[in-house]
Amino acid sequence: MPSVLWWGRFDPGYSRNRILRKQFADLGWQVRAFQPRFAGLGDWEASLRRLPRPDLIWVPCFRQRDLLAASRWAKRHRVPLIFDPLISAYDKQVDECGKLNVGSTRALRLLARERALFRHANRVMADTPAHADYFVRVLGVERTKIEVIYVGAEEALFRPGPLPPETPEVPREVLFYGSFIPLQGPQVVVEAARLYQGPPLKWVLLGEGPLRRMCEELAQGHGTISFEDWLPYEKLPERIQRADILLGVFGATPKAGRVIPNKVFQSLASGRVVVTRLAESYPDALLAAENHGLEWVPAGDARALAERVATLASDPIRLRQLGEAAAATSRQYFSEAAVRRQLEKALSGLATDGLVGYC
């Protein structure tokens, strides 16, 4: 049985890690974990602990700090290494948060450091084709070293379910959930709720984050807008099922156009129509199709969002049909089986290059 070592100070409960670790196991791999006390000295700790040599090292999402030490140990033991960054530190600091100006000394230094870092991996995983293009264009990763594996959703938790019963006393519900960051554009949701003109509707924003206070201030005086605190991950599927329409992301930042957030995968798998910004991150075939359970609106356009939600809320039959289409889209493009095929392809690529001999 081949073994993969999940290397880094990662969160085992994060959905990307949970899903991929399960897919490795389903493919017949033994999955082990090594979480060093200090990321930069991980190779020293691994040597002192005499870690058994795995067939593959996987440095998971957000663990840029672990990559260098992991690569040193991997090269010493002749083990291939896959890096699954999910984000770019340069992208986050410059394009997303605007903390560093493009072309500034600090930005250029960060870019050079990250470009050098990515070269230590035998393969780099991207969660969308748009992110793969970014890694090639900006970070200088060789196209042949990149594979795309969508995040998907855990099917044991997120399953299609019927819409809530329609009653005159209880309005339909549109649900946004997330971490209230600029990429998600929660303020666009609040503004859309303020502009909304349509059948009675309850707008719910669930979660915590830097923009929540601002959103609460914008929502003052509007009784149809409410906020809920974050809830345990295991209770999220049931919360989704209580809503009729799910909202994705609406930020106008460059990064917002390169991602498919967890909640879009989870909402589609739950059989709910998702209204979200148009982005190049989705499969081309899906973008070209109709009736896929995704309703596109321009980034940052609150009025377009309000109008699209009003159209959906006015047609219960169409709402149900779109929910069924959403579940079908999840099965076709983002199911665990689809993710597993993408992972298998990435591992086969390593074997083709002679880096491993077990795929």
Can you say where each PLM-predicted feature lies in the sequence?
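A short, well-ordered alpha-helix in the C-terminal region of glycosyltransferases
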Residues: 311, 318-332
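Conserved donor-binding/catalytic core segment of Leloir-type glycosyltransferases
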Residues: 5, 166-194, 204
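Nucleotide-sugar-dependent
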Residues: 91, 184, 232-239, 246-268, ...
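Conserved acidic donor-binding segment of nucleotide-sugar-dependent glycosyltransferases
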Residues: 288-303, 311-316
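Nucleotide-activated donor-binding/catalytic signature segment of Leloir-type glycosyltransferases, i.e.
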Residues: 171, 213-239, 296
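Carbohydrate-associated surface elements
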Residues: 130, 152
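Active-site proximal beta-strand in glycosyltransferases
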Residues: 74-93
